[in-house]
């Protein structure tokens, strides 16, 4: 971000185009998935299983499948995580994407497999360069 003013940073965040906002909807992978795929973060998609790591006691450690992703607000709806309205109808409790970890990936899309592979290769190259620079010193 260019400015240090919080108000300007919020303004830029709220007015981001959807293709850039999608990059903000990422979450850490669980330790097992990090070891399996060799990456640390990935964009959340509908169908992923996530675990809530921050929030109220009734939300904390809740695990469920992502039902909906809202790019406008940067929040996700998780299956089974609902509250009741005054008339008794259940509605989803929206959780910010940064407050969850991904425990199981939905790999039904071949494009997502390509994304994971591309990110893994980029991370390996980064680690090699980092290792070479530390050896040179």
Curated annotation (Swiss-Prot):
Keywords: Ribonucleoprotein, Ribosomal protein, RNA-binding, rRNA-binding. It comes from the Archaea. The keyword Transmembrane helix does not apply. Pfam families: Ribosomal_L26. GO terms for molecular function: rRNA binding; structural constituent of ribosome. The keyword Ribonucleoprotein applies. GO terms for cellular component: large ribosomal subunit. GO terms for biological process: translation. HAMAP family: Ribosomal_uL24_A (MF_01326_A). One of two assembly initiator proteins, it binds directly to the 5'-end of the 23S rRNA, where it nucleates assembly of the 50S subunit. Located at the polypeptide exit tunnel on the outside of the subunit. Belongs to the universal ribosomal protein uL24 family. Part of the 50S ribosomal subunit. This is Large ribosomal subunit protein uL24. The gene is rpl24.
